[in-house]
Amino acid sequence: MHGGGPPSGDSACPLRTIKRVQFGVLSPDELKRMSVTEGGIKYPETTEGGRPKLGGLMDPRQGVIERTGRCQTCAGNMTECPGHFGHIELAKPVFHVGFLVKTMKVLRCVCFFCSKLLVDSNNPKIKDILAKSKGQPKKRLTHVYDLCKGKNICEGGEEMDNKFGVEQPEGDEDLTKEKGHGGCGRYQPRIRRSGLELYAEWKHVNEDSQEKKILLSPERVHEIFKRISDEECFVLGMEPRYARPEWMIVTVLPVPPLSVRPAVVMQGSARNQDDLTHKLADIVKINNQLRRNEQNGAAAHVIAEDVKLLQFHVATMVDNELPGLPRAMQKSGRPLKSLKQRLKGKEGRVRGNLMGKRVDFSARTVITPDPNLSIDQVGVPRSIAANMTFAEIVTPFNIDRLQELVRRGNSQYPGAKYIIRDNGDRIDLRFHPKPSDLHLQTGYKVERHMCDGDIVIFNRQPTLHKMSMMGHRVRILPWSTFRLNLSVTTPYNADFDGDEMNLHLPQSLETRAEIQELAMVPRMIVTPQSNRPVMGIVQDTLTAVRKFTKRDVFLERGEVMNLLMFLSTWDGKVPQPAILKPRPLWTGKQIFSLIIPGHINCIRTHSTHPDDEDSGPYKHISPGDTKVVVENGELIMGILCKKSLGTSAGSLVHISYLEMGHDITRLFYSNIQTVINNWLLIEGHTIGIGDSIADSKTYQDIQNTIKKAKQDVIEVIEKAHNNELEPTPGNTLRQTFENQVNRILNDARDKTGSSAQKSLSEYNNFKSMVVSGAKGSKINISQVIAVVGQQNVEGKRIPFGFKHRTLPHFIKDDYGPESRGFVENSYLAGLTPTEFFFHAMGGREGLIDTAVKTAETGYIQRRLIKSMESVMVKYDATVRNSINQVVQLRYGEDGLAGESVEFQNLATLKPSNKAFEKKFRFDYTNERALRRTLQEDLVKDVLSNAHIQNELEREFERMREDREVLRVIFPTGDSKVVLPCNLLRMIWNAQKIFHINPRLPSDLHPIKVVEGVKELSKKLVIVNGDDPLSRQAQENATLLFNIHLRSTLCSRRMAEEFRLSGEAFDWLLGEIESKFNQAIAHPGEMVGALAAQSLGEPATQMTLNTFHYAGVSAKNVTLGVPRLKELINISKKPKTPSLTVFLLGQSARDAERAKDILCRLEHTTLRKVTANTAIYYDPNPQSTVVAEDQEWVNVYYEMPDFDVARISPWLLRVELDRKHMTDRKLTMEQIAEKINAGFGDDLNCIFNDDNAEKLVLRIRIMNSDENKMQEEEEVVDKMDDDVFLRCIESNMLTDMTLQGIEQISKVYMHLPQTDNKKKIIITEDGEFKALQEWILETDGVSLMRVLSEKDVDPVRTTSNDIVEIFTVLGIEAVRKALERELYHVISFDGSYVNYRHLALLCDTMTCRGHLMAITRHGVNRQDTGPLMKCSFEETVDVLMEAAAHGESDPMKGVSENIMLGQLAPAGTGCFDLLLDAEKCKYGMEIPTNIPGLGAAGPTGMFFGSAPSPMGGISPAMTPWNQGATPAYGAWSPSVGSGMTPGAAGFSPSAASDASGFSPGYSPAWSPTPGSPGSPGPSSPYIPSPGGAMSPSYSPTSPAYEPRSPGGYTPQSPSYSPTSPSYSPTSPSYSPTSPNYSPTSPSYSPTSPSYSPTSPSYSPTSPSYSPTSPSYSPTSPSYSPTSPSYSPTSPSYSPTSPSYSPTSPSYSPTSPSYSPTSPSYSPTSPSYSPTSPSYSPTSPSYSPTSPNYSPTSPNYTPTSPSYSPTSPSYSPTSPNYTPTSPNYSPTSPSYSPTSPSYSPTSPSYSPSSPRYTPQSPTYTPSSPSYSPSSPSYSPTSPKYTPTSPSYSPSSPEYTPTSPKYSPTSPKYSPTSPKYSPTSPTYSPTTPKYSPTSPTYSPTSPVYTPTSPKYSPTSPTYSPTSPKYSPTSPTYSPTSPKGSTYSPTSPGYSPTSPTYSLTSPAISPDDSDDEN
């Protein structure tokens, strides 16, 4: 926990963290000891004579009262004193209302008289309970309570023969008797509660008849509890040390400190006391009264009254909402706020003040859009920026800048508000008279204003998912609103109609680093929720992109130039125009191709793509240009729209993110917007009323369609009137009618809509918005132009509101379209008043629905989060919760993160056996085919070698097994799966990078493929470990991916389809491995919260009310939010429980048999088949009253099989409905049998034949024989009979089951429409075939009985009632069912949520072995700590419970730590740093006293390395411009390689251009004399020949300032996708230009040094270094082992097999293939812009800085002797030998990125005080630098750049000369004697001191880029015989064999000056000396 307390007293070291919180009940003694008011508080008054009264309620000992006062106890003032407790001694004990229930429970468990436990603690059951409930005291009490419930006698000693329910073995018998329980053997009373009083009542009155019911006084209870022993306390679930039972009764009342109940002072009036003080006053008053009464011996009833009142007051102080009690009021009648109300609820203490607080350093204002900002920027108003501060610590590197800010003070922006001295003093600059007098020292803190480039968190409520809070970089802009890029509105769900957003400025560098690395917008582009981007191109840009990429868009030269101006990554080359004559024209697609980054490949379709185009002979040609193909970063064809640029999975943005990384994708967004929007300015887009008018023919069509629809409706109405309408099965007549009408009207709307759309021209602006996907849909168009359509309320047509009509304007019972809400006008035509009213009704419903839904889903989301908040991926990769229970063994069952997977198809699943064999089996018999696909020698090998053939057969076998496995996993044949590494796209990339010609045979040996894949799948490890379980787990986790891998990379497809070369295949395998490893979920990831958000967010989009979808006999199912609620609440009674019954065998196919089963299941009562019933008085059956029955009745009575005499004269006649009978397959006989079975002989039931015209049952009561005896009472009996018959009638109709299962009220039978319910079988040929089988769906569930029915498929039959599945099938089944149900709810409205989130929720709910509801009944019954529970719901109850049981909270979860202000164990907080204390000793002091160390520029303000105010649009716009030199611009190489570590930025032709930037760095583009490669003001690196490939230009170089908006200037010419090769004939490129020195290798893009691996240097380029014969990429002799391979790449290993510079053999993302360092991967720790030594915010990174410490990633212990303080370590020191083992060029610490190896400053020594990387004087491109300025050398006034003698390239010039100083007369380049071997040279010469002021690396003399290397320098001539790189004897400084030894300080094998590309070194030479 970082320092608490006020900021001034910040403790530097972290305070101790709280490990555990113990709860308990305070004992009276402890309360008294804790209290500061001796003798208790006796007076209800607060003051006496205006002074606080001692012993009163505002006792001065309890805390500070006045602002100015001090506390009498601790002498602290208002802010320091925390307040102190007092106490009141109560005259009589009272119950504590919070513990009342607990008190009763304990009372019921112990003997009323002797306080012994009612069950002996030796009872085995008790032992069992104790064992089971370890650590769960509450459970223990519950179990013991259940045991004691039945006991009503306290078991005594002797009677105790064996009262246990447990039989004891003989031996124990006497032992028990002897010891006994020692109870008193008396009867126990029942304990009852009424209000706040307890009563004891005895059921069994003992011999000495006691009174039945007594009032239990708290004293009595206190006595009983006191006598309970500690052991028994423990058995009762108490913790005797922290919570004894008698403490639950209040004897001493604590008085809360004053700070808890402050008084409010009103102006001029008396103090208003807090509610608690009022309450305490009441208690004190009544307590004093009670004590007085007791002393005076008042009557018992008076005292009882007083006690009752005291009890009431104490209770209402704790809880003022007690049921059955009056509220305690203030005089005004407002109920008092009790302690409980203070804590609970959203506004309460816990949720309102502890879990969520208001914070400082936040800002809020309205948002407005700004397309010119990058997506990760936010425009902040200057007024806000000047008010919010960031505390920056003063270091030697920022002291000048901060001093300047302090000088400006708070009044001007940018300035500072406070200085905090190192002793903690705060100086407020607002009130300081002369801020300029204040001097800073290192270690002070300056609270400076927010400025450009600061990192902030931006947030919009409601914060539904993590993309609602993202990190942005600040850009200060004028005016008062936040500005943000349009693309970011999607994740924030923001619009600009007045939304406000919040901004938080983080206050520590750690926080900033975390936000920058984890939460910046570009890193959030892809969401793990549904593995797709959440940001796309929106609105005008989207509309424009569609227009821009159409086939007919051509741009003139001027327009193209203008657009390229806005492309920040442009490299200065305009592509070849598509059309040359009559004048050059460029297409829109061409320009868009320049925006697309890197080598992206992508195939999508346009929104208007017709489906039938995908097959057939012309599938590759798209007539409407609707198929989008992006290949190698070029848009080949297709119109872009929302599908390719929106937020869908697989869009261009998504691929860019996955392939090129987040940084490049950020630029992609920005570039699309700037370029396209600027084109739209020229092109224009508007919409007017004219766009909504169609032609007259269309209107005619619309009229006709509506007329016909109305006609149809009238016909349907007539049919219904005439009873000709057949109800569809399962629907009533009315429903059927409504459905038909609805269908007719909806069809009419759709038809008119489509005709309206067809009539619109291609140029219609409505249409262009809809087609591009920017706004609106087809329905909107049709509503505007054609028909608004049917208005619905609750899913039905407008209901009748008045009597039988909707509005008084219509006639009654009008079912026509108009009267029931069909709007036949369009919006354009306008609505009639009635239409308008109906439309308003429909609209209003939508609004209400939304409002209600928001509250519902908000609560659901909160519950989800609370239930899973602490579920995280731990370091062993399991997913566990805060109490370390395993929830999942691997996250998502595959251990991968949601962001990095994508949809892929499993190739082997679908095809038939034949197709499968043809595609996957390597056919080595077909020689002709082999020769077409493989090279000759391979063909021979394959044909001749049986071993190879066996291997290939085995491979095919393996794939066949895979296919079988897949067909078990995906029985439906759905081959779309979510996997990492899109293999097909990676293969495509490989083909492009390696220029694979798919028509040439491949040199890839099939066996190499098989082996390679085998090896690879061994490397893809999700579960480490070698035991059988781990191996099994590993197989499960990677099964699908391995199958996918084997089927995609099988030898046959490699040879035939992909034709990869061997080298390409190796690249591919490495790439897959690295991508797979990057996809693994990070330990520390809070996947619980992630899952909760991912489910809660789509829930917000769901519909609330389930509209019953009008369909044919479909049953209604609950969907949407109500269903989600049912599922996570695990409701016992779902609204629509239902079974889906699948059938077996014949029944499934035969409708009749299926019908049989339907009848067997559907519950049928007599009522369902009855037409009518009647009761007749029919005394004489022979002549029955009902004439039509006479005939068949006679048949019965002729030969009666019953006693006719006993028959009752009353007759119940039931007429059955024949249709229903046949429908239900019932016979009369069955019914009669059922009746007889039910009533036996008491009823007589006769029935007619099944074929009779009417089916009739006649039922009579049979009177019992006794009735016959009592003739005289007959009349009464007759009366009774008919009443009795009535009862029987109703009973029979409703309760008598004829057939079926009671719970199943209705069964529907249908053929499935969707595939997932069809039966999928696999035919003989191995194809999937979906069969339609009858399935039954039921209303009501009874799974157990249905599964046991005959012909029901027990495997597939399923229920949607979760609880039922749990009871029938158990926990595993219910987990799967829950997952399926959730998936169904979410996917119903087309959302998709990645499986891992659903799975995690299901696992959370079921991992305990029972169903845990996501409600307080589930979540709060877990074993998590009380603090977590109380932050969810039932706050006070949870805390009381915890106190009573003495629980403790282990502080392992998230909520607990947040409450206590500690760092939660989440994300970066879940592990500790391991610091090697020994290594810290070798740190290095920075000399802080040397003047000039702080970099003061011309104005004294230096913004170079600090967040600079340079503009994002153009540096020229800002007043402070020194930092904004072009060198610092976006095209400084840093961005180039920043986009992809060391690879070509966007240049398609330079597939593996190691420089990372195209050769666009020509001096022509350098507006200042410096070279464009010259370092930025804060960069200590000088570009040098190897610079192109040197990792020093990685984004981690301080020159790359990710926070400098200047970093993205639109003129930045760094990438040119179309530059095929930079033609040296370009006019701006003249070799005579003084800046252009062909001999300065780092200085000419045509010089080979620009990336030897770059294929873009075509050998045809004339200036392609003809002097270096070995240097031609096509020359076979150029191999990586050739010594001329740049030694500047220190860790490059020439043995890397696949490295051949002629082939772009490495990919930016694959660590194994970066030529600059095999170990260099974007995930490697050194590749991180925030890595501590590289943090762009820490300008101090230089070897002189204390930060340059062994923990820096550059420094590794492999060079133990390197200590920055060691004076001998300096390249100039004689004992520095490159041959020394510690300095192997591969040593990671020896990397060109380290400033100490700036080879161009050979003598640079770390101890040189003057060397500061950000010294602005060191920028050749700095505006103030002019080569002609004679005085420009900060250290030597005599130095003149015009002197020819300063050319470091002069062969004679040796920087190692000790005398070398610009003033030394001895030095003359023409003096032939001058050579390092000259005797004057001795490193010990005193003059040679690296600190010598004349010898400062900052001196411009040392820039090889200095324009003075002029080719005219006579000594440096390429024609000089010495100067031939091929001359074997050539040595850079002197003839071979001279003492130029490796110990010479100037020589460094890694010095880029000696790189192969430097024409000044001989290949052999560099090799020998290496």
Swiss-Prot record:
Annotated region C-terminal domain (CTD): where?
1593-1960
Residues recorded as bearing Phosphoserine in the entry: 27, 217, 1843, 1845, 1847, 1849-1850, 1857, 1861, 1864, 1868, 1875, 1878, 1882, 1896, 1899, 1906, 1913, 1917, 1920, 1927, 1931, 1934
A GO BP entry is: transcription by RNA polymerase II
Q: What is this protein called?
A: DNA-directed RNA polymerase II subunit RPB1
Positions of the region Bridging helix?
Answer: 832-873
Q: What is the required cofactor set for this protein?
A: Mg(2+)
Q: Where along this sequence does the record place binding of Zn(2+) 2?
A: C111, C114, C154, C184
Q: Where does RNA bind?
A: R67, R460, D499
- Which residues take part in binding Zn(2+) 1? C71, C74, C81, H84
Q: Which InterPro entries match?
A: DNA-dir_RpoC_beta_prime, RNA_pol_asu, RNA_pol_II_repeat_euk, RNA_pol_N, RNA_pol_Rpb1_1, RNA_pol_Rpb1_3, RNA_pol_Rpb1_3_sf, RNA_pol_Rpb1_4
What family is it from? Belongs to the RNA polymerase beta' chain family.
Its biological purpose is as follows: Catalytic core component of RNA polymerase II (Pol II), a DNA-dependent RNA polymerase which synthesizes mRNA precursors and many functional non-coding RNAs using the four ribonucleoside triphosphates as substrates. Pol II-mediated transcription cycle proceeds through transcription initiation, transcription elongation and transcription termination stages.
N6,N6,N6-trimethyllysine modifications at: K1866, K1873
**Region feature (Trigger loop):** 1083-1124
Example of a GO MF term: hydrolase activity
Q: Does the keyword DNA-binding apply?
A: yes
Give the organism the record lists.
Bos taurus
Modified sites of kind Phosphotyrosine: Y1860, Y1867, Y1874, Y1881, Y1909, Y1916, Y1923, Y1930
Q: Which residues carry this modification: Asymmetric dimethylarginine?
A: R1810
| Residues that coordinate or bind Mg(2+) 1 | N493, D495, D497, D499
